[in-house]
Amino acid sequence: ALGAAIGIYRAGKTLGKPVHIVVNDPSTSIRPLMAGYINNPDYEPSMFIDRNQAMELVDDNTVVVVVDTNKPSYTECEELLYMTKTIVVLDHHRRGNEVIQNAVLSYVEPYASSTCEMVAEILQYFSDDLRLRNIEADCIYAGIMIDTNNFITRAGVRTFEAAAFLRRSGADMTRVRKMLRDNIDSYKARAEAVRTAEIYRGCFAIAKCPSEGLESPTVVGAQAANE
C-alpha cells in the first residue's frame, strides 16, 4: 500500500497540492521504505502523519485517496471517510460485503497484480509534467515485487509494462532488494517453517511458523507461504 500511496503523493505534488500520507504504526515491512523519506530535505516533515493529525487537517476541499483496500475498517483512519465529501478508492482486491460506500470514484481492478501496478499505469498518463524521483519509483516497484512474489505469481503483461515504466523512471533493482531484505531472525523463522512443513494429500503443505522474537510474525508467515 505504501508504494501506491507514494505514487498518489507524487501525482498530488505535480498538481501543486499539499499531500499527506496517513500511517499510524509502520510495520517492519514498510519502515525500510519510509526511511528514505524521513529527514530527507526533498520531502516535507509532514509527508507522513498519523490519524489524529489527519483529522485536524480535514476541510471542505480535502480529497481522500484510499489505496490497496476497499474496506473502511482496513484503512488507517476510517473517520476520514465520514469527514470528507470527495473520496477515491484504488484497489486490486475483490469487493466483499464491507465496502466504502460514498466514493466519488472507485477503481477496483481484481485482475491487476497490485495497486502499485494500477497507480503506475495512472501515472504514465497523468501529466506530461509528472516526474517520479528515483526513490519514489523504487517504492512503487517494490510494491509490485511484493505482491507478485518477485514477478512469479499474478504477473501479467500490464505488470511488466508498469515495471518497465518504473525502470525508465529510475527504479533500481539493487536498491529495491536492499530495502526488502529480511533481518536474520525473520529469515531463520521462515526457513524453519519451510523445513518443518508436512505435505498433506500430496498437494497441501502445512507448517508452523515460529513467532518468538519477531515483530511481525504474520508477515513472516505469509512470506513462508510463498516459498
Identify the function of each model-found stretch.
Residues 71, 111-116, 135, 186-189, ...:
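A general structural signal for short secondary-structure boundary/capping elements
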Residues 45-105:
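Active-site cofactor/cluster-binding pocket
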Residues 90-163:
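Short alpha-helices
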Residues 7-15, 40-43, 81-88, 125, ...:
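A glycine- and small-aliphatic-rich helix-loop capping segment at beta-alpha/alpha-beta transitions
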Residues 36-42, 106-108:
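Short, hinge-like loop/turn segments at secondary-structure boundaries
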Residues 1-38, 54-56, 60-63, 146-227:
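Hydrophobic helix-and-loop "lid/oligomerization" segment in the mid-to-C-terminal part
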Residues 56-59, 79-82, 99-100, 132-137, ...:
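Solvent-exposed alpha-helices and their adjacent loops that cap or buttress functional pockets
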Residues 9, 71-72, 128:
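Short beta-turn/strand-loop junction motif enriched in small, turn-promoting residues
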